[in-house]
Amino acid sequence: MSLKIRLTRGGAKKRPYYRIVVADSRSPRDGRFIDKVGVYDPMKPKDDPARVSLEAEKIQAWLAKGAQPTDRVLRFLDAAGLAKRPARNNPKKAEPGAKAKERAAARAEKAGAGEDAAA
């Protein structure tokens, strides 16, 4: 049985409220779960301590048993210091694309030719 620590949605239309639960990965999002380990209320302000409420002992026990947190829950656990989220590093993201490199080279060449003519 593959266990996940994930969010289940509750609340009214356009007023979401999430429970953080441990569930079998094959069960539906809002279906049967094994244990409730916290809550997340996105309608509260970001600096409100009650926005995310976690039961640390239960979560650590489930992580020790092999439960895998989803990406969003892993963010909450990392913020609470219960789990470490690996750093994402994409050095090529800031690098300009091929066309931008061509334009920059053409601009530099044109500027170099203009300086030679002025000298």
From Swiss-Prot:
The keyword Ribonucleoprotein applies. It comes from the Bacteria. Residues 81-119 are annotated as: Disordered. Keywords: Ribonucleoprotein, Ribosomal protein. Gene3D superfamilies: 3.30.1320.10. One of its GO terms (cellular component) is cytoplasm. Pfam families: Ribosomal_S16. GO terms for biological process: translation. One of its GO terms (molecular function) is structural constituent of ribosome. Residues 92-113 have a biased composition (Basic and acidic residues). Coiled coil: none annotated. InterPro entries: Ribosomal_bS16, Ribosomal_bS16_CS, Ribosomal_bS16_dom_sf. PANTHER family: 30S RIBOSOMAL PROTEIN S16, SMALL RIBOSOMAL SUBUNIT PROTEIN BS16M. Belongs to the bacterial ribosomal protein bS16 family. This is Small ribosomal subunit protein bS16. It comes from Methylobacterium nodulans (strain LMG 21967 / CNCM I-2342 / ORS 2060). The gene is rpsP.
